[in-house]
Each structure stands twice: as structure tokens, then as C-alpha cells.
């Protein structure tokens, strides 16, 4: 079963997978133990303090060193002129990295006029890591 957790929701124990909309990221600190977190192409849209909060919430001791799959641009200029960088996301030296490399399957996106594909302005990187909760 799959569910969406909104701002008033809590983890539904009947669901195998729960989606949390980006604007409700603070819910992560309220949910029961999770084994896996996935973020694809949205941390690159956030300011670094928000990204660091995500990781802090995921590192909560309830989650017992969860797996985190992160797939985002290496760097991106935000609308306010700031730059967000994958390497600055709050990774720690005591995290256990499974892989960390360029993502071959997500380097382009569809465009409509003219129809075709366009490369992102920065390569996409993905990382699978056990986040140390201690």
C-alpha cells in the first residue's frame, strides 16, 4: 500500500510506502521508524539550511541509520542567485556510502517545442548511503 502524508498526517502503519510533499518535510521528524528515504530532483530546489534539516530529521535515532537515496544536480543556481551544491548537503564522514556517482539514467529532460530532449545545465549525481544516526 502507498500513501501520502500531508501536514497533519502521521505515518500510516498499513502503508509500505509513504510520500511526503516537499513543503511538508518537517513531518519526517514525526514519523515512526523508516528504513529508506528517497529524494529525486528536489533538494536542488531548496536552500542549504532546509536540506540540512532533512538530513537531521532522517538521522533521528528512531530511524536507526536508514538508507538514503539522493539523486540531484551537482550544483544549481537558485532563483535568488544562491548556489546549492550536492557536496554541501550535510553528508558525514561516518556515513556508509554504497555508491556515489554520476546518474546515467537522469541527465536529460523532455522539452515540448520543438519536441525532443534537453540536457540539464549541471550533471546529475546519485548517492546511496546509510546515514549514521549516532
Predicted regions span which residues?
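S-adenosyl-L-methionine
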Residues: 1-31
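Flexible loop/turn segments at secondary-structure boundaries
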Residues: 26-27, 45-47, 76-79
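Short, conserved loop/helix-junction motifs that constitute active-site signature segments
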Residues: 31-32, 57-64
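A conserved beta-strand element that flanks and buttresses the S-adenosyl-L-methionine
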Residues: 37-38
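Hydrophobic adenine-recognition pocket in adenosine-nucleotide-binding enzymes
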Residues: 42
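A short, conserved alpha-helix within the catalytic core of class I
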Residues: 45-58
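Conserved beta-strand signature within the Rossmann-like core of class I S-adenosyl-L-methionine
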Residues: 62-78, 84
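Rossmann-like AdoMet/SAM-dependent catalytic core
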Residues: 88-134
Amino acid at each position: 500500500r502507498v500513501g501520502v502524508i500531508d501536514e497533519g498526517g502521521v505515518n500510516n502503519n498499513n502503508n509500505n510506502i509513504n510520500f511526503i510533499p516537499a513543503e511538508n518535510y518537517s513531518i519526517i521528524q514525526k514519523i515512526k521508524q523508516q528504513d529508506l528515504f528517497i529524494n529525486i530532483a528536489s533538494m536542488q530546489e531548496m536552500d542549504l539550511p532546509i536540506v540540512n534539516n532533512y538530513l537531521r530529521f532522517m538521522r533521528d535515532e528512531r530511524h536507526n541509520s536508514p538508507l538514503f537515496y539522493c539523486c540531484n544536480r551537482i550544483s544549481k543556481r537558485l532563483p535568488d542567485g544562491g548556489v546549492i551544491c550536492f557536496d554541501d548537503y550535510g553528508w558525514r564522514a561516518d556515513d556508509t556510502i554504497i555508491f556515489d556517482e554520476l546518474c546515467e539514467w537522469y541527465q536529460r529532460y523532455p522539452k515540448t517545442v520543438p519536441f525532443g530532449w534537453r540536457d540539464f545545465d549541471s550533471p546529475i549525481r546519485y548517492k546511496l548511503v546509510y546515514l549514521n544516526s549516532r
